[in-house]
């Protein structure tokens, strides 16, 4: 019987690129929030490691983050790297939704179960950091976190003594454009001054302020360079969304709605367009 693990995507609630670091990466600050759009990875025991994928355009060799995660976990735990993995891909990649990083994190969790190993959370986090800056977020249980450094220094977000969860309905629209993160960083202008307090802003749950103050520094260069992203953002702004933003470095844009009915109406209005969409209703 195969073991299975879901790999949920994320959105960014604000994203500030603060400075370029000596190692070539950038220091950022953002709030990451897990969503219910997810891939699924299954694993069955095998003598060697292999990967298949429902999306034939994705690599299934060592370029795939799932296999990188598998090999690094096997090395860290000193066990043979054997499993037949299958990735059922639902979340678009190259969209700023963290799907590749989430797939890697899910692979680490899944193979720890399959191989009956119990690495510490610190070991998993260290492996995750070698794969991608978003991987540590997907290895934590908290649904939302304030992220700094490369995006891998995390403080779980809480409100009124409980884990923070987005109280609004979320509609994501993804145009048919993939954006490489290094390309986006080459076009962004870092800035440290006059930044709002992202944590306080998010925890306020004040959508009337979010649309103006919850900014993403990638939005200006990405929407200028890629008309499809700008068109998706314009389409969402034509709905009753109270806040519209880019996720990560794009290409996904999202709208937040006070009422689920308004989000469902917006979803219908986007159907004629060349967009992949996903609706996450507000929690009851």
UniProtKB/Swiss-Prot annotation:
Pfam families on file: GHMP_kinases_C (PF08544), GHMP_kinases_N (PF00288)
Catalytic reaction equation(s): 4-CDP-2-C-methyl-D-erythritol + ATP = 4-CDP-2-C-methyl-D-erythritol 2-phosphate + ADP + H(+)
A Gene Ontology molecular function term of the record: 4-(cytidine 5'-diphospho)-2-C-methyl-D-erythritol kinase activity
KW Cell cycle (keyword) present: no
NCBIfam families documented for this protein: ispE
Family of the protein in this entry: Belongs to the GHMP kinase family. IspE subfamily.
UniProt protein name: 4-diphosphocytidyl-2-C-methyl-D-erythritol kinase
Species of origin: Salinibacter ruber (strain DSM 13855 / M31)
